[in-house]
Amino acid sequence: MAGHSKWANTRHRKAAQDAKRGKIFTKIIRELVTAAKLGGGDPDANPRLRAAVDKALSNNMTRDTLNRAIARGVGGDDDANMETIIYEGYGPGGTAVMVECLSDNRNRTVAEVRHAFSKCGGNLGTDGSVAYLFSKKGVISFEQGDEDTIMEAALEAGAEDVVTFDDGAIDVYTAWEEMGKVRDALEAAGLKADNAEVSMIPSTKADMDAETAPKLMRLIDMLEDCDDVQEVYHNGEISDEVAATL
């Protein structure tokens, strides 16, 4: 949506996401286990694990649950025998789409992802077909806040950029490995974020109209319903006017 942060866009779809909360928790736990398996159980020394912990807490997962998942990864749980796979493709209206998966069966995963693209008027691309349009960043989001205060604290903590949106939301962008450190510094300054996550930020946007926007939303929903899909990133831009018709 034009003039809104990624977090605001996420909240726009919150009702649908709440219905998927069980599946979301399962995916977060899988990422916690895998991150701990690959990089150790200390979030301060393992940026991927720290990002997973931040995401778990942003989704109201209890400390007990996430600590058990980390312990499973450190202990070599079978769920840790997963590999990260990134699929790239084109969605409705020529949108660039990246699909991050954790899978123990590439054939199963690619079949599910390809099916979602084909059902929604898109197509799966080759490696590198759209990746050049995205940059991996940490995104720390505030629904409201004083821009000058947040900007000063964020830049002092090592953030790369601070963006204010039309609805008053503020996003702080960081190198993805530094997101946890910057978030800690902001909290130490009395600035508690509403969300923190590692994301793929597009360098260009594709405007969605009343015809293509519903198709893009359907593609995102179908992909997120796949058990192996962890995250879906895209460069579709949906205006407030079009969003009101969805």
UniProtKB/Swiss-Prot annotation:
It is found in: Cytoplasm. GO terms for cellular component: cytosol. InterPro entries: Integrase-like_N, TACO1_YebC-like_2nd/3rd_dom, TACO1_YebC_N, Transcrip_reg_TACO1-like, Transcrip_reg_TACO1-like_dom3, YebC-like. Signal peptide: none annotated. GO terms for molecular function: DNA binding. Residues 1-20 are annotated as: Disordered. The keyword Oxidoreductase does not apply. It comes from the Bacteria. GO terms for biological process: regulation of DNA-templated transcription. SUPFAM superfamilies: YebC-like. Keywords: Cytoplasm, DNA-binding, Transcription, Transcription regulation. Belongs to the TACO1 family. This is Probable transcriptional regulatory protein CKO_01097. It comes from Citrobacter koseri (strain ATCC BAA-895 / CDC 4225-83 / SGSC4696).
